[in-house]
Amino acid sequence: MIGETSRADSLTAPQFAEYHCQRVQYTTGDVQWVPGTASFLSAGTKPNDEGIVQIYQLRDSRCHLVSSHSVPNGITCSTFVRDTHVALGDSDGFLSIFDVERFDQPLFRVRAHAREGGRKCRVGAIDCVGGTMEGVGALEIVTGGSDGCVRVWDPRTRSPVLCLEPEDAKQRRDCWTVAFGGATSASERVLAAGFDNGDVKLACLRTSKLVWHSNARNGVCKVQFDRKDTALNKLLVTTLESRIRVYDLRTLHQQEGFAYTLWKAHSGTVWTAAHLPQNRDIFATCGGNGELTIYKYKYPRERVIKDKQTGEKRGVPGTLQPVAGKADVAQQPIRSFAWHRDKCGLAVVASFDQTLRVLIVTRLSNL
């Protein structure tokens, strides 16, 4: 077991167990479970700046390397668009889709982001919705780049179906994270984007308009809706300086925006976070000190109140409760974390110490 839990909670609180630890010879950019399998994908950058994609399978209490493939550029982010098709963003601004059973030729490849004059620009974040994955309707992929642009792609065409960027090129900020949500029908899509200056923006794809924006005061490392395929409920935002924000998306106040709760976590940057697929009110956060923490969001008695003077509805934020002791998973910052969609509590973690770890978090179904 790893992590600490008080004696009073030791019989009921979730516990962290390391299933296997795997050293790699590259810097991991992202890890993802291959849908419906006991295998996971690890992608990153080799010392010579080439990209590498590896598939590992859990078997006999170990991680066994199934395949390893080199690609031209270092991989920065990934998302599965079908059970065996993965979309990769790289350090040279390309978006590529590969079949995990063959990486010799991409199924789709386009330069998604580039600076003026064709200068090098990386894809900083990626997400997808629709197709055979979460949500309904056609497959759409969103990418955010260091050129300050957020673009939505349909793999059936090589041009973006939507591009969000500031009119003034001097105001462009690095986009560090993107996420889809609100995919309740074939036409309904909402995307969230976080930027290095703390900006958080929500856009509606159906109307191609910015719905809401705010500033989290610190660079935004991760945004994630609690579910992609339901009506908007909550948005999780993690930032530099150890901050976590959870916005209640049910009620938008014209002046105050969405209500949110603020929490200070870890002792450094909260690099990433992930909602538990089996319970959208539970999520894990990963810190710059290598810590992993589990939280549960608790709703208030009333999520909406009326302003006595104007009569306008205002949201009421909930509270965050740590439900497990902090686990010292790695010696360096945790770069990527992914829950298994079918096995509650099974997770894979990648950190900057060039190590992949498969963890089992127990008792989550009892929370």
Feature names for model-found ranges:
Residues 302, 314-317:
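Intrinsically disordered, low-complexity regions in plant nuclear regulators
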